[in-house]
Amino acid sequence: MQYALTVIFQSILFVQCQVGEAAFVISQEHEVSKSISINMTLFPSIKWIIHKSFYLYLTYFVMSQQTLPCFQAADSYNYSHSLPKVQFARFSKYTPQSISYSSTQMYQQKEYSDHITEMTNVHKSRKRKLMVTEDQWGSQITIPKVIQNRPLIEKWFVQKRFKMVKVRNIQRPQLSYQLLSALTCLNSPDGMISTTEIYSFILHHWRYYRYANENWKNSVRHVLCKCQLFDVLQVEGLSRKGNVYKLKRPDNVEKEMIDVKTLGCMQKDSRGIDFYIKMLAGQIGLPRHLFYSIVGNEMPEYAGPENSAIFYHLLSMRKIIPKLETRYFLEHWQMEHKATEPMFFEEFVPYSTSLVSCVENISSYGEGVGPGNDELYDLSDRQIICFHKNIRAYHSLQKRCHKMNYSNWMTPSLIYVQEAVMDKEIVEDDIRNGTIECEGVARKEEAKKNFQDPALISIYN
């Protein structure tokens, strides 16, 4: 009998009947069902069956000591609005959202707020519960707003399908990825490197990879996994996360990785064999990380010591480079850099929004103008060309400041930069065409070189 009564009542559940001008909204097991408003005239026999079924159904739950479902009566007979579906935005993009209702469509405020809070939080995994706020009419629900610090420097991002890689007639250096990874490891302060540091090191010193297909990065990862000359370490720290690589025998790199063909490539390099001797001795160092985290790895055509130097010089004058603002950077593809850059000592810090949200965390910010100077500075087109052309003078200034133990030697004062770099004359054609003849002296020296047999040459002789 109880089962039959239950079936009868379940068949008429979710129906609002205007019997005595009353409406019922029924929710069952914490799930809000749709409210259906029916305005019709029932026969007396049907009304009697509904009343009796409802009465027996309540009696059954009371006798069996079960929990009654939640019923709430509306304050208006023409209420036909379903319960609101609260919409959430993503947690990282919380924005205020509000849902308003008229006074004729509201429940009793206290019961309604409790009901909505319970409805949205039960059987749902959320990091934080919905906070319900009320206005003066008690008719508004506001999703809380999460305030995030906007980064001062945004990471450059260019979709791969829109990347236009320029074709340059540059010969690929005959250096194995195994050797390039080993050279990166030798110049690391702690002897450990990540794949990101290898990419930055290669882009910084070899112009060919700035215009090559990015599949070379897959080859680097493959070599690191298969090569038995590297140890793979798991590091969980503030600076590095994931796999890092370390040479097993750093003193045997010349014997194990440099053959006659590789030595001949080093001899033909415009920077000379001395450049590779310094690399094997760990006297070159790694490129500065923030530039490659923001610009260099995403737009490799702007990698290199020249663009890295002007990036930090702009930061030293409190100039924040806008996203994808390429006016300050030039492509240096005609010749390799002469390797006049000083050796920097920086701890590897990966890019994060929290890192660049505060100026105190940005390396070299404001060091060129000094404390107490709030003026904003920028570079003209002529000054940008002049800086790139006279990059040797800028590197020499850095080395002199380092010898004098200046704390800001990596980004010298603007006064020194103006005297040593900006005041030098440049050719008018360079300003008009926007091109720079890189290392013309190095070209002449390369043409005059008389190479010996690579098999008879030791890299240290």
Curated annotation (Swiss-Prot):
Residue ranges the UniProt entry marks as DNA-binding: 171-262
GO MF term list:
cis-regulatory region sequence-specific DNA binding; DNA-binding transcription factor activity; RNA polymerase II transcription regulatory region sequence-specific DNA binding
Cross-referenced InterPro entries, in alphabetical order? Fork_head_dom, FOXN2/3-like, TF_fork_head_CS_1, TF_fork_head_CS_2, WH-like_DNA-bd_sf, WH_DNA-bd_sf
Top-level taxon of origin: Eukaryota
Q: Quick one: a GO biological-process term for this protein?
A: regulation of DNA-templated transcription
Q: Any idea which UniProt keywords this protein has? A: DNA-binding, Nucleus, Transcription, Transcription regulation
Q: What happens when the gene is disrupted?
A: RNAi-mediated knockdown causes significant reduction in the expression of 21U-RNAs, upon simultaneous knockdown of fkh-3 and fkh-4.
Tell me, what does this protein do in biology?
Answer: Transcription factor. Binds to DNA sequence motif 5'-CTGTTTCA-3'. Regulates expression of a class of small RNAs, known as 21U-RNAs, perhaps acting redundantly with fkh-4 and fkh-3.
Name assigned to this protein: Putative forkhead-related transcription factor fkh-5
**What is the native source organism of this protein?**
Caenorhabditis elegans
The taxonomy runs:
Eukaryota, Metazoa, Ecdysozoa, Nematoda, Chromadorea
